Amino acid sequence: SILSADFLRLQEEITRMEQGGCDVLHIDVTDGHFVPNLTMGLCVAEAACRATKMRKDAHLMISRPQDFIKKFADAGADLILFHHEATSHPFEMIKYIRESGKMAGVALDPATPVRSIAHYLHAVDAVLLVTVCVGFGGQTYIDEMDAKVEELVSLRREKGLHFEIQVDGGLTP
């Protein structure tokens, strides 16, 4: 995630990621409402997207993702992840993302059961499990999340699906 980058040297940090073998740039976006923290806005995300040819994932930890999907798509995100907890209309979110020509993903807070998204897993390209208190960098991985990853892998296999599984938080070396 570029959340841990030095924003005064964003281009250098992204280049270092590429040279280190990264193939996805993860962009954490918070709004101070959905989570009690502000990270970066659209301008920084757009600059980061322009700075690389890596796949760009926009992780929208925001209260009204439907208001920003098109903006982050236009900024250069390839995969847009909305939080399950931020909407009661996940199929609409997926539709908005697809209409923007992008891949769609859903993110889950640590306390949210995996089964709560089972009814729409067939419609997403990725599921991101947040493995720390959502919205803040520099935290320790929640060990209990291992079981959640295993549950998601089993559910994907049971349903014969092929979505990507991502984890976010507490994974820096």
Residue ranges: model-predicted function:
Residues 89, 113, 135-136:
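Short glycine-rich, flexible loops that bind phosphorylated cofactors or substrates
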Residues 94-96, 112:
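Predominantly soluble domains enriched in secretory-pathway, periplasmic, or organellar proteins
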Residues 170-173:
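Acidic, divalent-metal-coordinating active-site segment for phosphoryl/phosphodiester hydrolysis
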